[in-house]
Amino acid sequence: MLPNTVEIRQSISREAIVGHETAWCISDLGAVQFRHAYDPQLLETIRRKALELKSERATRKHLDLTFITGADRFIPEIKELINDKRRLDALSSFAGVRLEPYPLSTVGSTVTFMSPSDGAVDWHCDGVPVTELIPLEISDPIIGGELEIYLGDCEVGRAKVNQRLPLPQRNILRIPHSMGYSTLGHFLGIFHRTAPIQFGNRITLVLNLRSAEKPFIDDNRLFYLAADTDQDAEWVMEMTKDVWENQLPAYRKFEAARTGVLAPAVQMPAITSPLPTVDVRTSW
């Protein structure tokens, strides 16, 4: 899937982006763009099917982005890439830790559509720990559409954007996308966006991953996921199950190794569906 000698176009560490060490991370991976060797016919099939599904499945609800959530549910060919061991091994070598596919059905893969009419993606930090961006189509010419990464603490950048203040140009790293090149980013806690596209378009396959050893390092909050997928609630139960079966045991194992205190066994509660009714407090 990926050759032994990979052409790396651009690489930057997490510490170089943020400006200091961070504890809430899976490794010091920041971002790396490399030439991939994914089957071009497979990618073309995914692109074609995504375009056929766009009017029915793509939404534009959050971060000014038009995309198909959980795209592998509708385009089974995506699963070939998600589960390819050679791909996972290669990406893990970039990250410095063993990676696994992100488990939630609505979040594991997306196909994004970016253009002047479809939007791009606004400034944000990722909820998922690691993301691979694989361009399926880039118009020629295209004006805009670069990955822009804020160099500095994400809270500083977010505060400026929330106050409608411009980010200093010296603090923005721009990485253009190219066909045949994939970008792997550990964008959890890293402020970034896609530069608005003024002319042309880009279609991108987005495959999300996490640390196999530390699946609890994750910033996806319920409200944030719901901002994209408020049309169903199945993913809420998936997330709950993953917490008890994967994240909590891994976290207790990590804490036991850190503190030397034996971790208690995880007691899996009964998880029922549908979701219970919650009374919202109206006075304080």
Regions found by a protein language model. Give the residues of each.
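Soluble, non-transmembrane catalytic domains of enzymes that act on hydrophobic metabolites at membranes
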Residues: L53-K54, D118, I190-A195
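Hydrophobic residues positioned within well-ordered beta-strands of beta-sheet architectures
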Residues: F34, V130-E132, I203-L205
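Signature of the catalytic double-stranded beta-helix
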Residues: I26, V32-V107, L275-V278, T282-W284
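Short loop segments at secondary-structure junctions
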Residues: A37-Y38, L136-D140, R210-E213
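Conserved double-stranded beta-helix
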Residues: C154-W284
